[in-house]
Amino acid sequence: MMKLVLFGIIVILFSMIGSIHGSDPPGNYPLNTYGNKYACTILGENDFCQKICKVHGVQYGYCFNSRCWCEYLEEKDVNIWDAVKRHCKNTILYPKGK
């Protein structure tokens, strides 16, 4: 009986540790000029997805399920044209600001 109680306590503690750790950060798949997700071949962290995510206005991204995934990418910046308008610092293209 004591072993069963001890086992139950251990299970509860491990489940609490998992819930304290939290869930995955929110994010999105960025879309290119044709409205498609960016394909990638090297799963996990790679330079290509990092660059794509920076163009879309976020700092971190990686290859997940053969597509670039950007953490904390908001819905308004998923499309490349919307992201460029919002994050481009080029005063020739946007002389009066955004």
Curated annotation (Swiss-Prot):
Instruction: Recall the GO molecular function terms of this protein's record.
Output: potassium channel regulator activity; sodium channel inhibitor activity; toxin activity
Per its UniProt record, what CDD domains does this chain match?
Answer: neurotoxins_LC_scorpion
Q: Which residues carry this modification: Lysine amide?
A: K96
| Principal subcellular localization | secreted
Single GO cellular component annotation?
extracellular region
Entry keywords, A to Z:
Amidation, Disulfide bond, G-protein coupled receptor impairing toxin, Ion channel impairing toxin, Neurotoxin, Potassium channel impairing toxin, Secreted, Signal, Toxin, Voltage-gated potassium channel impairing toxin, Voltage-gated sodium channel impairing toxin
Signal peptide (UniProt feature, chain positions):
1-22
> Which Pfam family would be a valid example here?
Toxin_3
The record's disulfide annotation reads: C40-C63, C49-C68, C53-C70
Entry keyword annotation includes Ubl conjugation: no
Lineage, top-rank taxon, reads Eukaryota
Q: In which tissues is it expressed?
A: Expressed by the venom gland.
SUPFAM superfamilies in the record: Scorpion toxin-like
Signal found in the keyword field: yes
Q: Where in the cell is it found?
A: Secreted
User: In what residue span(s) does the LCN-type CS-alpha/beta domain sit?
Assistant: 26-89
Q: How does it assemble?
A: Monomer (edited version) and heterodimer (non-edited version) of this alpha chain and a beta chain (AC B8XGZ8).
Protein family membership: Belongs to the long (3 C-C) scorpion toxin superfamily.
Domain comment (free text): Has the structural arrangement of an alpha-helix connected to antiparallel beta-sheets by disulfide bonds (CS-alpha/beta).
> What does this gene product do?
The heterodimer non-edited LVP1 induces lipolysis in rat adipocytes. Induction of lipolysis by LVP1 appears to be mediated through the beta-2 adrenergic receptor pathway (ADRB2).
Q: What is this protein called?
A: Lipolysis-activating peptide 1-alpha chain
This chain's source organism reads Buthus israelis
